[in-house]
């Protein structure tokens, strides 16, 4: 199987060759994103791998289908950038990466802590050797009421973890 990968970041490159060898597939790597100017590079391949900023709209998918592409994977959790109806119509299977909802929840809470404790302001001041407290005193999590829109896999993990901080969940 031959796969062309678009939008490959430097930190991804080191994983692609070992995985390709293990799976006995050929992978061609491009840092450029999939678009109307680069889609012709997919000619002669069996599958395409993209990232979130690559748009796989109806026009792109029609061209890929014409090249015989049977599979499209996105190296992201989200897949809004892919026209699923068109992919289905053109017989292109679509896949995305799995994820750990706990990992995403951890990052969400990291951002909440950074905001409530005014971490960016503290960091900026520390660069100037200013360690005064004026204007950087944050809020304590146990005093906060947090509204969560959507209690799916990630939202449920965030709610569970915030209870450990003593937050009121709405």
Region roles according to the model:
Residues 45-123:
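Phosphate/diphosphate ligand-binding glycine-rich loop within oxidoreductases
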Residues 41-43, 66, 141:
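A short, aliphatic-rich alpha-helical micro-motif
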Residues 1-45:
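N-terminal glycine-/charge-rich "phosphate-binding" loop or analogous flexible N-terminal tail
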Residues 8-11, 31-35, 52-56, 76-79, ...:
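Short beta->alpha connector loops
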Residues 136-170:
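Rossmann-like dinucleotide/phosphate-binding beta-alpha-beta segment
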Residues 26-30, 95, 170:
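General small-molecule cofactor/ligand-binding pocket signal
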Residues 28-34, 52-53, 125-134:
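Short gly/ser/thr-rich secondary-structure transition/capping motifs
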